[in-house]
């Protein structure tokens, strides 16, 4: 209101407010105006603070507007000053009565009026009293106590001070419009947010954020505070002279007044709360409201007076009125009249507005000012609301408005998050050694001096602005019910409020503890061992709200955490806990941030087990860190956060220790485990993905892994809930194999990804959806472990979370983990040297990866996901191998309920038999996990996620072998398959060469894997299950039982895992399988596996490749080479199995696919064998539902793998016959066949996929780094290929590529052979069958396919990219969705596909450098660069716009799942497969579905009813290898386009090609835009030298890729900026921790970008 109005109000208001105040009010107004004019903030700010809200209200209610305006609502300064003066006058008048009593009486810290008869409000979490209207007004903009900043959600209303609580009203979280109207901008950072910490200079009213000051203030000063300029000695505002004099007079009078309060200048002058923009606004609003109310009260009939209080309380409670006493209904009429009259006045006044400033006559000036203010406010609103390019650029560059006298824009000081700031953000009181800062008043001397009340005129006058002076005086006194209506009690300065003790010495100690317990991503560990909050979360802040602070710290980025921490520290943890009730874990309080994040996720997963696991993970300090990262993920993706957070928390808290502790489905024990591995992980900030949860789950079987507690994180086998941590630890210790069992625990699984920063989140996010896997994978890049991890996790969580949440997650955490694993597989697919390729263990591809992915030098871990769900069904064992760089500290393990499964897996690592048994045990112990993982679609992804998380955290590379045992409980529960996924993570030194050390690690890992795979291969049924499991980590739950059934095979594999020779053999097999996998959708995965397996050791990998080529049929021999004797045995055993399967398969047309299946089974026995068996034999039929149909099923499997691989697993098995026939019948319409099965599981899968999709999208940027990583992984297969070449160590890459290059040799095979080989490969990929397995030779075509294994491997690389493109475009989520939509079985097949994609992604990264020559080529065609670009978009839009190939597949082929999984492979027609000119096939990845469906059907039919697509994809892959190599160098999109054109020879292909081209152009445009946005966002960091040129390029590439592959398909500058910032943080972190592979990985992503 205008000063005049205010004066009028005052005049009309009760005597105390009388005219005497008008005079001062006017000067105050004038001064305020001048002040405002000069400061541009003071007047406006005050007005905005107090008046803005009222203005909004007034304008909303015009009548009230006038009244309130008059009462000083217009200008907070004017109003505040006037009111303050009035209050002062009142004080003088009432000095004798009011003030004397007031001195001793408690007074409201906000309005400084003594509590008399007004209603009182107290925040629920502290004992500070405020006038009800004051606290209500305050809560509109900040829900923290004005005194101690404690967060509160409810206000307790009391009739009087000390009275009993009448009622509680929830805080209105609606930010007052005041903020928008006339914001005060910080003079340093130029931002107007955080108003409760935006200090207003008492001299010039300029705003400064506490954290922007130098040095930053830890506490909001209660006394006067002067900005640096005003604090300068001798600085006196010219404007202050006049106005201040009047104020000073009133102040002096007030001080002289013979009242205790007045005699105590401090009491009268000292503010009870700091003067911030928030406090000023609230005071102004309250003052305005009270004056208007008082005015109205005058006209209120006496009889109504008594009801005034009640009405006020009621009004406040109902939110009808801003102020308790503001609008009694009766007095409204008079007010309206007056308002109307005044309005008329205002109108002219407004017209005068322009002259108002010049004319300073009291009334006119005041009116003018106020009107002007309104204008200003409106301007402010407009300015604030509109975000122009210039403003955005200026903000990015750190430019802000020029200083008053300057025309050159000043450069803003970037807001450096500080503990104080973080604490403030969460409402935590600032730390003070002396206790309550306000009680002891330990403020800076500068503040004290400026506010020195002893020299009222000198000190005050020198810098106090009118509003500042007023802030020391009470505002208009609230109308008290007891007071006469005509009398407004004079405002009485209130003595310092007794404040709740804030953190004291003990508090600071606790804060330090909180810091120790923060998620690794939240804390920066310095070389000297000291810790500092990375997120600038003040120690006290963190300590204040253990979970809360972490959540906050962890951040705003982590919305969920934030929501959780919204309460006080206690509230944060408890709030979090409630969310993750199932996860209740001591670690929670310790790891609040993560806890907060986790709870949200936990909420999503209805499975308490999973929640518990997560919670447990949270418990440990390292877990805390990890949880933080997951939090980040959570932040990135709220949908994902619940499950993901839970997982992450679990991972964080229950890292490997958690796993150890939890030997069975119970996830809670896992957290205990976390402690052991947490210590080592803490430094690895990237580890806060949610490994805790996984750890919790694996706890039962994790104990075996405990020896590798340190390695837990590296191993990434922490627990199902704590993949990230486990991964790290594992990467540190080669004996991580035991950890696999830990991973085994279903609940823990989701968090597993959180183990390494990114990877850990990957696990949880994987649980969410396929898309997350890559994100996590990306984030796992060595750079910013913590940050990436956090970001990554969300992406995964979101991506898979929806799936998991909807189906599996709610049922049990296992599903999440399963999904994670799938993601992980994808990530790790081609990342032999790129730890980020943790995704390698895609659901279908996982087993295969196991062989190739494991690096001898890497620590081997076995992750088993137990899902008691389908234990009755034949067990399918899936062994997935993939190499993960140490970027991610942990490799998530399937979070299936039974930790025992995990520990068994670990045991299996120690001993084959043990491993097998354990894997089986997990099935039983996974009762909970299975339940959690019930939604079959998510489970495969869980496993993949786990794999993803398995990546090592730092520079070390780790090979993760995923052994998934899928046991269909019974045909009745086709949707949920119990899958036990055992992951063997091999850690290898940063040197990525697959040579000796790598080879050893890989050998060891391979041995483990081999033993696992042997086990898988041993049991036919188990093998099928395995195939399926391997294909889809998610099916791990369902596979749990199959694993048991495959116990022998598993033990074999486990033994292999544990024994280097076996592991080597397994690796070789895995490699072969990988190749075959890569041929098919699973081939993609396989490729990664191989690349992982081989990548780690150059020699190993090369051997592997040659073996793959040579021994695609005899996987055992290549593996033997790599694995040494055991490898040979393993391979031979697998060979036998494969042959058996082959024989069995011949029973079905799928004979051709058998070899691949078997082979895959060897490396990823579960997935490959599973699929193959499902296709090939009755048993395979039984498990077929579990496994993916070759083509449709495979796509479905991939999809399902992501959404409901397990679910599909069972149904798939039962539906297998149908599916095969359907696919065979309608190869062109595999979708139809898939759709048929989709009804069974499609809903869950789709649900999951859908959820994943949104989450991934959400993750896009905010979670952007995480999600972005995932998306990059998912989206840019071709890009990834390039990245692989660039980022992966050349030697490893070359080695990895070697097999891929060998793949081109494959084309030598007869065209039919090639086609069959490709198909087989795909089939094996889809069916978890190792294309390279010799047994698949049964059919003539299959034999060529087997020969093709090398080609398959090569194709696998392309296939992987293809799958990845699908994965990227479809990603786990999109693909899952599409396939899920297609059909449950399709989903099942999608699991492998997704995995394959994951593998592809991994493979691409791993092979990037070497692949550029050949493997890259293959991959490029498989996953055209354009696809990588579009993948994200496509992945998320896959259903409606699958990657070109996928789309084509969908449009041409009804089996989107298959198409997606094998975009690259399906691309080639049987004829194309035959023709060496298959290169077009790579381009066809997008269109491969159509091609595969159209021409491949023949081959597919030959191979397997469902395998067709897979086979086709494989065939394509085979031929495309050369093309792929070419595309590797050229944009994948181009390669894909070219390849597609060629591959689109069939009409469907042509259509696909068109679609692909369109998609490519669309992606290209999007990429261009993304590049521009990313450059804009990263420029400031680059200019500030925060990132090096290389990092700049890497981040650009990665961010662009992520953005291009976001589900939303839009480029949100804000999200881009967040994504870039996350990347920058990650790289910073990587530099800090000297992550050797950070450089490599970023390039990988960069290539994608």
Swiss-Prot record:
Biased composition, class Polar residues, residue ranges: 568-589, 786-796, 835-848, 859-871, 1531-1540
GO terms, biological process: protein ubiquitination
Region entry Disordered, spans: 1-79, 324-398, 534-600, 644-871, 888-1240, 1281-1395, 1407-1439, 1455-1486, 1526-1556, 1630-1649
Record's compositionally biased regions (Acidic residues): 54-79
Residues where Phosphoserine is found: 5, 445, 455, 814, 845-846, 864, 867, 915, 936, 973, 991, 1124, 1128, 1202, 1229, 1359-1360, 1371
Residues modified to Phosphothreonine: 330, 917, 1404
Molecular function terms, GO-annotated: RNA polymerase binding; zinc ion binding
Keyword terms of this UniProt record: Coiled coil, Metal-binding, Phosphoprotein, Zinc, Zinc-finger
Composition skew (Basic and acidic residues), residue ranges: 685-697, 727-742, 802-812, 1012-1030, 1054-1063, 1141-1151, 1181-1198, 1345-1356, 1541-1556
Coiled coil location: 1549-1579
Keyword Zinc-finger attached: yes
Compositional bias annotation for Basic residues: 334-353, 367-382, 1000-1011, 1043-1053, 1064-1090, 1106-1118
Superkingdom, taxonomy of origin: Eukaryota
PROSITE patterns, per database record: ZF_PHD_1 (PS01359), ZF_PHD_2 (PS50016), ZF_RING_1 (PS00518), ZF_RING_2 (PS50089)
Pfam families assigned to the protein according to its UniProt record, in alphabetical order: PHD (PF00628), SCAF11-like_C (PF23030), zf-RING_2 (PF13639)
Zinc finger (PHD-type): 183-233
UniProt cross-references to InterPro entries, sorted A to Z: PHRF1/Atg35 (IPR047157), SCAF11-like_C (IPR057031), Znf_FYVE_PHD (IPR011011), Znf_PHD (IPR001965), Znf_PHD-finger (IPR019787), Znf_RING (IPR001841), Znf_RING/FYVE/PHD (IPR013083), Znf_RING_CS (IPR017907)
Zinc listed as a keyword: yes
Subunit structure: Interacts with POLR2A (via the C-terminal domain).
Annotated protein name in UniProt: PHD and RING finger domain-containing protein 1
